[in-house]
Regions:
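N-terminal secretory signal peptides that target proteins for export/translocation
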Residues: 1-7
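Aliphatic-rich helix starts adjacent to a transmembrane/signal segment
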Residues: 8, 12-56, 65
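Low-complexity, Gly/Pro-rich coil/beta segments used as flexible assembly/activation regions
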Residues: 45-164
Length: 164
């Protein structure tokens, strides 16, 4: 008896191909989502660095003023009408500058610069003294990642002395 051997043909069925395609699609979708999350984190860190730079630029501008100009509320208000630097971040941040006598304050001079560039005088100190002042510069904004409120702040003490 001569029988021809029956060979089973190897191959994949349609459900196996569909499962493989779904696994591949999920894998690539995960990779793209991970990339998008990383880009959002990079954007958030850029915002934080821009805020830190904005605070430091404003602080340096105030620190380099003559003491009589620093204690003059109208001079500081005019100074705040322009942004601390030319970054795009300055257009969406709110700056608050507080100036008070140091070590014992007899009131606080406070200015707020909105994201639109409007400067308001929130309060004016009765006396800022003639030797030392404490300057607080704060920036607040809504973070692009998660739309959370964020802020950066720096405080410095400036004396009435000669500039070198």
């Amino acid at each position: 008896m001569n029988r021809t051997p029956v060979h089973a043909q190897a191959g994949t069925t349609m459900p196996e191909v569909l499962v493989a395609a779904i696994i591949l699609a999920v894998f690539f979708g995960s990779i793209f989502e991970l990339n998008a999350v990383c880009l959002r984190y990079i954007d958030a860190s850029k915002e934080s660095m821009a805020a830190l730079q904005l605070v430091n630029d404003r602080n340096e501008t105030l620190r380099n003023l003559a003491f009589s100009d620093l204690t003059n509320s109208s001079y500081v208000q005019n100074l705040l009408s322009s942004p601390a630097n030319a970054s795009e971040f300055a257009k969406k941040a709110t700056e608050v500058v507080k100036i008070s006598a140091y070590p014992t304050a007899s009131g606080v001079t406070q200015f707020t610069r909105s994201a639109t560039g409007t400067v308001t005088t929130d309060s004016v100190a009765a006396n800022l003294g003639s030797t030392l002042v404490q300057v607080d510069v704060a920036v607040s904004w809504m973070m692009s990642l998660g739309t959370r409120a964020r802020s950066e702040q720096v405080t410095s003490i400036i004396s009435n002395g000669t500039k070198k």
